[in-house]
A protein has these predicted regions:
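Positively charged, small/polar-rich N-terminal and surface patches that mediate targeting and assembly
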Residues: 1-73
Length: 73
């Protein structure tokens, strides 16, 4: 099975994941993969691998997050 690198954004609360999903179409909410630790059990996955761009976007939109990591998925 071919894996591809994706960006995973983790959150402490599901409300933050839902808020991000409601304002961008550049990814989707998924259960947290076993290789990643997260507080709420759900995360946001995107094929856009630009971590700094995501950090700025999250901060500009006042969305709290735990971590942003790249994983093979």
């Amino acid at each position: 099975m071919n894996k591809e690198e994706v960006l995973i954004i983790t959150f402490k609360s599901i409300q933050d994941v839902l808020e991000l999903e409601s304002i961008t179409k550049n990814g989707r909410m998924i259960p947290v993969p076993s290789c990643v630790k997260a507080g709420c059990g759900m995360c946001f996955m995107s094929k856009d691998l630009n971590i700094e761009k995501w950090r700025v976007f999250l901060e500009e939109n006042n969305i709290s997050y735990e971590d942003i990591v790249r994983v093979d998925f």
